[in-house]
Structure formats: structure tokens, C-alpha cells
Amino acid sequence: MPFLPEPLFQHGQPDRTAILLVNLGTPDGTSPREVGRYLRQFLSDPRVVEIPRAAWWFILNVLILPLRSRASAHKYETVWLREANMTGSPLLVYSERQAHALQQLLDAQGHDVVVACAMRYGNPSIPSVMQTLRKQGVERILVLPMYPQYSGTTTATAFDEVFRVMGQMRNQPELRLVKHFHDHPAYINALHQQVGAYWAQHGAPDFARGDKLLLSFHGVPRRTLELGDPYHCACLKTGRLLGEALGLQPGQYLVTFQSRFGRAEWLQPYTAPTLEELGRVGTGRVDVFCPGFPADCLETLEEIAMEGQSTFRVAGGKDFHYIPCLNDSEPWIAGLADIAQAHLQGWPLALPHPHVLEASRTRAQSKGAAA
């Protein structure tokens, strides 16, 4: 197997540390062709769809993509950002903002750590970003998937891709993995602050009157729970910890699951039918927050803020509020730094003195090294 090209080894070059923030992915644009290319890569992952490959290839390429690509392209068009300082997929825009803000915070704290973001599907890809980090002299990588709740369908496949790239490297960096942070105090605090800030600006629901807070997580097939995936339990724990932080009682907040795909049973209760039922019984106000999505994306901005609102109101509901995701809010960036630094312990976070590097280079060259 041929290995990836390696940067020329340089004596006296500092070994740097990097944090690689990994998210799900996004198409490069909103055309059906671009969206179809992204969906094909995403839905071809055997960790995402556990169906025999030959049968699934036919279903995906003949039955699903021809129709779903165009429908999804229209949905992406409704949320695509086209402002001067925010252009492109919301997920990519906010992911890059998170990486930039985390880089600034770590710089201000005196840490020499490179922060980069990559997507499991689409661009910037994990292979391309990892190669760029190697060219920057990175010898230690902390892989931090932006999935607070671990699942084999998300976190594990991000790790798979990192391992695949590592297998193609001649000179491999050290590697650490963050499996989850669904109950990390810094994450729960950031969620608490985000909801609290929204309520401070827009008013809080009247829970005594029967208003509700829905905590909507991305769904997965129920079969994954039965096969040992801990995702469901992690979502429930995040919901409970956030509810307690907000001072809510069970029943005032509800944990639901969205984005069901196909006919198989997924984790329940489903978000859309729950919103419909709350509207049908005349619930005065429903606030929806998506704790499992650290950055706003198609599933939050279109599926919840648009479709969810319509579902609730058409069924008879009155006041609908979508609470934005953590995105690049200050509490979340501070929390992200806390999570990362807990896993960086023991790794050098400062560059050696230039005199030390120069001495190393001089010694190597005296032994005949070219660089």
C-alpha cells in the first residue's frame, strides 16, 4: 500500500499539538448534484446504515438518491447563509467559527495549540485536514468529535476515518480521542447558559400554565440500542442534567428524537408527533432546544425551526420558540476549552525556546543531516 506524501523531516522543528474538531458534514453547495454527492458518501457508510451492502447499493442509488437529492437540495437552499461574513452551510460556518474562537482563547491562555475543524463527509475532509496539520509540524492530535453523546453511527465512524488516514501515514502522530462529553459540567453549563440567555431576552415559558421545553436529539434506529449503543442513555442523562440545572421538574421538559429515516422503529418519542400532540391539546408555548447539536445545521434550522414550528401551529399550538444551538457562544467556547484541556494533560502545550531548537538543528547538521 502506498503511503501519503510526508513533509521533509526537519531537525530543530518544534513538535506541535493540535485539536481536531470533527463534525458530520455538509454538501459543498445547494445543487441537487452537490447534495447527492454528499448524501451518497454519508449514506454509504456501513456504520450509518447497517444493511447488506449489495441490497443497500441498489436501494440507495436507484430508489433514494434520485428523489432525496432534489428534495434535500431545496431544504439546504432555505438555510444556506449568504451574508458578507457568513457564507455557506450553517454547519460549516459555525464549525469554523468555533475552531477560530477556540484558537483565540487558547492563544490568549498562552498555549501553543493548533485548532482545526474537519467533516466526516464532504469538505474540509478528515484526510485533507490531517495532512495539513502534519505539514504544520503537528506531532500530537486530539480528536474531539462534536457529538456530545457517543454513538457508533457518529463518533465511531469519525474515529474510523482518522484511523484509516493514520494507516496511510509513514510518520504517524500521537493520537488521543474524546469519546463523549454528554455529562461534562462545562458542556451542561454552556447549555444552561444558552437557554437562560434566550429566556432572558425573549421571556421564559410559563411552566405553571403548562408550557413545555422540548429537548430534541438526533434519532437513531432503536436496534442500535438493543445491540449495545449507549447513545439513548447519554441523551437522557444530558436532558436530566440540563433540566435540573434549569430548575425544571420532569414533565416540564421532554426529551424527544428527530430526523427519523426509513420505516424501521427509531428511538422514541419522536419530535414531530410530540409537537403535533402538544399543539392539538392547546399548549400555549413550546420552546425547542437541540442539546446534541453544538452547531446549528439543516436538522435544527429547517427541520425544527421551520417544519417543527409549522407542525405545532397547524395542530393548534400557539407560541413556538426555537432556541439556537451553542454555536460560537462564549460559554460554549470556554466549555470546549475545558473539555479539550482535560484530555491534553501531559502533552506539551508550549513551544521549546528557540535556542533549544537551534542547538538541536546544529547538532544534527554536524552529524551530516541536510536539514
UniProtKB/Swiss-Prot annotation:
Residues that, per the record, bind Fe cation: 218, 299
Pfam families xrefs: Ferrochelatase
Keyword Iron: yes
Protein name as annotated: Ferrochelatase
Entry-linked PANTHER family: FERROCHELATASE, FERROCHELATASE, MITOCHONDRIAL
Record keyword Nucleus present: no
Job of this protein: Catalyzes the ferrous insertion into protoporphyrin IX.
Catalysed reactions listed for this entry: heme b + 2 H(+) = protoporphyrin IX + Fe(2+)
Gene3D superfamilies: 3.40.50.1400
Assigned protein family: Belongs to the ferrochelatase family.
Metabolic or biological pathway, per its Swiss-Prot or TrEMBL entry: Porphyrin-containing compound metabolism; protoheme biosynthesis; protoheme from protoporphyrin-IX: step 1/1
Principal place of residence: cytoplasm
Keyword terms of this UniProt record: Cytoplasm, Heme biosynthesis, Iron, Lyase, Metal-binding, Porphyrin biosynthesis
